[in-house]
């Protein structure tokens, strides 16, 4: 879901520019907490859309994603995705640690133009077969394991085909007749492809290279998996991963420019041996990520041979 959030951020920046508002990816923006009590302890923050988006692609940063949600808006996101033909992709809440109680930001340009959505949270839930979707036999809540499944009908979601088709439009936008689905220009597509394909050691300010948590191939489930060092730097993985509640997904365009191997791959796997939702015991490193790595490696080797 974070990839379309980024796409619609670029889309909205272009919309604002067409209305005469001086804002771009590199523009400095000011974030002010809307909660009055929180504003007493949380100072205004100055950043840029470029930095926020880089953090999302490099380490799947939740806080950066939440800021962009305030910028784009829930209903605007859902309406635009539906208009673009991606009606199985739906945004309903922010990201952890607590998606319903994260900071809401007012976003302004350095010229003091207010550009955040800050719409009300009365979001209409899509009426489709995902309603009533439940997972698990137990759930972890407030430090206690409770019997009963967790209802996912109000969670963020996207179908595997939506994800697959979205990334194809980003990699090869000229191949689609309906390229007006998103209001993006050539520079926007170049920007997306650049950051989708970066490793952590290629980040803007090298802030992730000094943290051992963010190893070289962090956020690259395909090809690299749990390997911490990038052994073949000729292979570029243009991707966005997702991971929550036992589900791991990678959505990618994989290319080796030297050997002329390229393919799209979108795959998801659910690992939750104890059937407890929200306990953070999901066999990601043991099962999920190695599976995704081996799947992509097998396809890559077959195409190479």
Regions found by a protein language model. Name each.
Residues 21-40, 72-73, 94-103, 183-196:
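Acidic helix-start/capping segments at beta-turn-to-alpha-helix junctions
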Residues 7-15, 58, 62, 165-172, ...:
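Short glycine/serine- and small hydrophobic-enriched flexible loop segments
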Residues 1-6, 22, 42-50, 57-62, ...:
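Solvent-exposed, acidic/flexible segments
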Residues 2-9, 56, 81, 163, ...:
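Residue-level preference for non-acidic, small/hydrophobic
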Residues 33-34, 43-180:
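Active-site-adjacent helix/loop patches that line small-molecule binding or acyl-intermediate pockets
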Residues 145-305:
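Structured C-terminal helix/loop/strand segments within mature extracytoplasmic catalytic/sensor domains
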Residues 5-7, 11, 33-35, 72, ...:
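A mature extracytoplasmic/lumenal domain signature
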Residues 1-29, 265:
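Active-site SXXK
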């Amino acid at each position: 879901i974070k990839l379309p959030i980024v796409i619609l951020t670029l889309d909205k920046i272009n919309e604002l520019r067409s209305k005469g508002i001086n804002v771009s990816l590199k523009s400095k923006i000011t974030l002010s907490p809307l909660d009055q009590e929180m504003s007493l302890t949380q100072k205004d923050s100055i950043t840029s859309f470029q930095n926020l988006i880089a953090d999302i692609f490099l380490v799947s940063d939740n806080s950066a994603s939440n800021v962009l949600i305030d910028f784009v808006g829930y209903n605007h996101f859902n309406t635009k995705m539906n208009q673009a033909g991606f009606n199985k992709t739906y945004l309903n809440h922010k990201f952890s640690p607590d998606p319903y109680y994260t900071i809401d930001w007012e976003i302004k340009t350095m010229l003091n133009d207010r550009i955040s959505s800050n719409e009300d949270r009365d979001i209409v839930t899509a009426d489709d077969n995902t309603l009533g979707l439940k997972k698990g036999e137990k759930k972890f809540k407030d430090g206690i394991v409770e019997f009963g499944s967790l209802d996912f009908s109000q969670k963020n979601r996207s179908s595997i085909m939506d994800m697959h088709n979205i990334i194809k439009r980003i990699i090869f936008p000229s191949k689609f007749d309906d390229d007006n689905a998103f209001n993006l220009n050539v520079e926007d597509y170049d920007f997306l492809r650049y950051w989708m394909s970066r490793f952590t050691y290629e980040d803007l300010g090298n802030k992730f290279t000094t943290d051992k948590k963010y190893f070289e191939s962090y956020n690259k489930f395909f090809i690299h998996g749990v390997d911490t060092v990038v052994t073949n730097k000729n292979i570029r993985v243009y991707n966005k991963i997702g991971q929550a509640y036992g589900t791991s997904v990678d959505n990618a365009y994989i290319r080796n420019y030297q050997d002329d191997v390229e393919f799209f791959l979108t795959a998801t796997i659910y690992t939750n041996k104890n059937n407890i939702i929200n306990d953070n015991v999901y066999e990601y490193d043991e099962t999920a990520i190695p599976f995704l790595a081996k799947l992509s490696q097998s396809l890559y080797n077959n195409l190479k041979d």
